[in-house]
Amino acid sequence: MNSRERVLTALRHEEPDRIPVYNSFTPEVREALSESYNIDKSEIDFYLCHDCFLVELGVFNGFYLDFTKEDYKDRWGIQWKRIKNNYGFYMEIDTPPLHAAKDVYDYRFPYVDGEPFYEELLHICRRYGHDFAIIGGSVSIFENSWYLRGFQNFLEDLICNKDEAHFLVDHVMEYNLALGFKIIDAGVDILYIGDDFGMQTGLIISPQIWKEFFLPRWEKLIANFKKRKPGLIIAYHSDGNILPILDDLVELGVDVLNPVQPDCMDPELLKRRYGRRLAFWGTIDVQHTLFLGTQDDVRNEVIKRLKTIAPGGGLLLGSTHNVQMSENAIDNLREFYETVRTFGSYPITV
């Protein structure tokens, strides 16, 4: 069974030969793993036996355009700046392009044909699509909208400037519909969509706002994506606790939930409640276990997921976000992969 077969088998709720695995890393962690294993950075995913390739297009690739600059403006007109931390840096939005609610009426969206990473996606699909599961994203509505308007401003618009908010969200949806079609047509197995609607303990917005602005538009997008490619797997990303809208997402046709942060939603509860209809991608805590925990903590958490979530299929195991650098991160990642190699074969017997 090759990696592609392994992932697709698991996400269709059957047991493959072993648990499929995928992790993503910050640049600092990828560099440190390269040194730790004494291999080139470009070979890390192969060496660690990752079963997927993920290529992200759309508004989110503003995070990745140029790590060498202190700041830059992307094709959406979003100004980004580099923020340093103890172990490296990350990019965050400094200035959104839509300063006032009425600015949405004059904003010109970029052309979807100008997506800067589309050629990379085509290359990955052509070169690796037979052997590895290809995940293409990221289609967004809520986050794409607030990236343009600013987080607080957009939340206020959802209450106080509804006409402008609906106008913006409609145009964001249409862009992402076209983007999703391009990603699907490239040949991906899994379309990666979603919005961070969750905080640590609940939703950022009310269920009423979800139903007014976002549910009907996600319904349109998902229906069109599945019509475009029957059998397409839809993976929906939202950090945090989104239990209040999870029934809606399942009804809309979401196949996979990512990242399933265990401090926010109990993976075992989700498996019991949704395990026949929803597969899970992630579940290994990046806030504490991989970042601050011990190797024993990592081993115990991996074994717990193998015991409770992996049986019957339905699990793509990995971290719940990009693994960030810390004093423990590299040793903990090595422990993660060693534990998976030792205990991750089906039938799971730990």
Regions found by a protein language model. Give the residues of each.
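Short, surface-exposed, low-complexity cationic segments
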Residues: 83-104
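Segments that shape or occlude catalytic/ligand-binding pockets
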Residues: 32-65
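Active-site loop segments of alpha/beta catalytic cores
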Residues: 1-26, 31-39, 73, 82, ...
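Extended, non-catalytic scaffold segments that flank or surround catalytic motifs
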Residues: 52, 56, 61-62, 85, ...
